[in-house]
Amino acid sequence: MSVDAATVRRIAHLARIAVTDDEVPHLQGELNAMLAFVEQLAEVDVDGVEPMTSVTPMQMKKRADGVNDGEIADHVVANAPATEDHFFLVPKVVE
C-alpha cells in the first residue's frame, strides 16, 4: 500500500492538522515508511508464540475507581467543528 499526496492532505484534514504544501512530500515518505514496517510485521511467523501483554511480569497498581472529568472537557472539544454539552456532534449516517 502506498500513500499519495492527496491521502496525506486528507489525513491531515481529518486530524485537524495544518500541513503546508512543502511538508506533504516529507509526511508522505514518513507514512509510507510506517506502512512498510507494518507490512514487514505482518510477514512474521508467530505460530506457537504465546500472546503476552508485557515482556516482564508486572502487577498493575490498584486504586479506587472514582468519577473524575479531569476538568479539561473544554480543551478536549476545542478543535471540534460542532459540539453540544461537551460532546462531539457528528452527522447522522444511519436512518
From Swiss-Prot:
Keyword Protein transport: no
EC numbers: 6.3.5.-
Enzyme class: ligase
Source domain of life: Bacteria
HAMAP family per record: GatC
Family per record: Belongs to the GatC family.
Protein name: Aspartyl/glutamyl-tRNA(Asn/Gln) amidotransferase subunit C
